[in-house]
Amino acid sequence: MDRFYEVMFIVRPDLAEEEVDKIIASLEQTVTNGGGTIRSTEKMGRRKLAYLVRKFSEGNYILLTVDADGPLVAELERRLRVTEQVIKFITVRMDEEEKRLNKIKAIRASRTKVSDQPAAVEAAEAPAAPAAQEESAPASA
């Protein structure tokens, strides 16, 4: 059963664009040869890292979204781990996240807004305040 995953990885900032493309192509080939499908590939560019990773303060971020089964994802992670140019990676299973978000949306849609409901009892108008009486000014001599 294929599941939906996001694989974010960071490659060294000193790599040429062609080398980055080769790494991406080899990972895409791993997924397709293993029976998975690539939904999208996004190069997010060079960004500053929050902390030093293998003595690098910057890295090129790449996001792969794939449909794959568990053993294929394990193989993909193994290849990321042994590729020296990859300095960091994370794999997140997104189908559970989609289910959770859809459930929250359904709950929110089923709720009726307080502003949409008619008021149960219209507020009674307060009685008008009695008119202020004029004070008679004292006669000055």
UniProtKB/Swiss-Prot annotation:
<dbReference type="InterPro" id="IPR000529">
    <property type="entry name" value="Ribosomal_bS6"/>
</dbReference>
<protein>
    <recommendedName>
        <fullName>Small ribosomal subunit protein bS6</fullName>
    </recommendedName>
</protein>
<keyword id="KW-0687">Ribonucleoprotein</keyword>
<keyword id="KW-0689">Ribosomal protein</keyword>
<dbReference type="GO" id="GO:0003735">
    <property type="term" value="F:structural constituent of ribosome"/>
</dbReference>
<keyword id="KW-0694">RNA-binding</keyword>
<feature type="compositionally biased region" description="Low complexity">
    <location>
        <begin position="117"/>
        <end position="141"/>
    </location>
</feature>
<keyword id="KW-0699">rRNA-binding</keyword>
<comment type="function">
    <text>Binds together with bS18 to 16S ribosomal RNA.</text>
</comment>
<comment type="similarity">
    <text>Belongs to the bacterial ribosomal protein bS6 family.</text>
</comment>
<dbReference type="GO" id="GO:0070181">
    <property type="term" value="F:small ribosomal subunit rRNA binding"/>
</dbReference>
<dbReference type="GO" id="GO:1990904">
    <property type="term" value="C:ribonucleoprotein complex"/>
</dbReference>
<dbReference type="GO" id="GO:0006412">
    <property type="term" value="P:translation"/>
</dbReference>
<dbReference type="Pfam" id="PF01250">
    <property type="entry name" value="Ribosomal_S6"/>
</dbReference>
<dbReference type="GO" id="GO:0005840">
    <property type="term" value="C:ribosome"/>
</dbReference>
<dbReference type="GO" id="GO:0005737">
    <property type="term" value="C:cytoplasm"/>
</dbReference>
<dbReference type="InterPro" id="IPR035980">
    <property type="entry name" value="Ribosomal_bS6_sf"/>
</dbReference>
<feature type="region of interest" description="Disordered">
    <location>
        <begin position="110"/>
        <end position="141"/>
    </location>
</feature>
<dbReference type="InterPro" id="IPR020814">
    <property type="entry name" value="Ribosomal_S6_plastid/chlpt"/>
</dbReference>
<dbReference type="InterPro" id="IPR014717">
    <property type="entry name" value="Transl_elong_EF1B/ribsomal_bS6"/>
</dbReference>
